[in-house]
């Protein structure tokens, strides 16, 4: 059987018109829910103005959409006021790259810091990039080899399998490997883990 297309009832068009009308008339949120947050309920709940009730025709989803739009408008107005006052919004500090975080993780492991703890994402990054001398410099590679000695389980098995596959690939290329440093790193990892 062929599926029949569902006709959009006129009721939704009426709801959309009412939603536009409600947003044009003004916010449903009273001055109690101003950005200062003095009169707002706990956890930022919206407080309706006493004179205006939400229209019963608006579904909960439509109300959420309307509230999101109003919140966005309030934030925009707040930024505009700050800009006019000459204050610049503070930008969050730049996030550190994955390389920096992973190498910092490795250094903390080597120094046996109390705040060091296993982090799978950092270990995964190190295992993926350990053959690249640009991403894991030579001064950190010896530390990485010491870290790999303690590698356990599936991570150890996969690292050995990948190293063997890379070695086979280098052997097939011939006697002149394009990256001798990479080949040396692969050999060191294989000798350590095999």
From Swiss-Prot:
Comp. bias (Basic and acidic residues) = 61-83
Q: Which Pfam families does the entry mention?
A: WKF
Q: Which UniProt keywords apply?
A: Phosphoprotein, Secreted
Q: Name one GO biological process term.
A: negative regulation of cholesterol biosynthetic process
Q: Spell out the GO cellular component terms annotated for this protein, sorted alphabetically and separated by semicolons.
A: extracellular space
Which Cys pairs are S-S linked?
none
UniProt GO MF annotations:
hormone activity; RNA binding
**Name this polypeptide is given:** Protein cholesin
Principal subcellular localization: secreted
Region annotated Disordered, chain positions: 1-83
Residues with Phosphoserine modification: 23, 59, 97, 175
Localized where?
Answer: Secreted
Please state, per the UniProt record, what induces or represses the expression of this protein.
Expression is induced by feeding and cholesterol absorption.
Determine the domain of life of the protein's source. Answer: Eukaryota
Q: In which tissues is it expressed?
A: Secreted from the instestine, secretion is induced by feeding and cholesterol absorption.
Biological source species:
Homo sapiens (Human)
What is this protein's function?
Hormone secreted from the intestine in response to cholesterol, where it acts to inhibit cholesterol synthesis in the liver and VLDL secretion,leading to a reduction in circulating cholesterol levels. Acts through binding to its receptor, GPR146.
């Amino acid at each position: 059987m062929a599926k029949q297309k569902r006709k959009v009832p006129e009721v939704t068009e009426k709801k959309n018109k009412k939603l536009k009308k409600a947003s044009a008339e003004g916010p449903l949120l009273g001055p109690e829910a101003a950005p200062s947050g003095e009169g707002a309920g706990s956890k930022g709940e919206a407080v309706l103005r006493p004179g205006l009730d939400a229209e019963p025709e608006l579904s909960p989803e439509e109300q959420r959409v309307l509230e999101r739009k109003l919140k966005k408008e309030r934030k925009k107005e707040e930024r505009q006021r700050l800009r006019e006052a000459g204050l610049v919004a503070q930008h969050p500090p730049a996030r550190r790259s994955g390389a920096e975080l992973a190498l910092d993780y490795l250094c903390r492991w080597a120094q046996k810091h109390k705040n060091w703890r296993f982090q799978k994402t950092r270990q995964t990054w190190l295992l993926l990039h350990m053959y690249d001398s640009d991403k894991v410099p030579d001064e950190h590679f010896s530390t990485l080899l010491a870290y790999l000695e303690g590698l356990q389980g599936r991570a150890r098995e996969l690292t050995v399998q990948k190293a063997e596959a890379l070695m086979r690939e280098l052997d097939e290329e011939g006697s002149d490997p394009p990256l001798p440093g990479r080949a040396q790193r692969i050999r060191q990892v294989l000798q350590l883990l095999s």
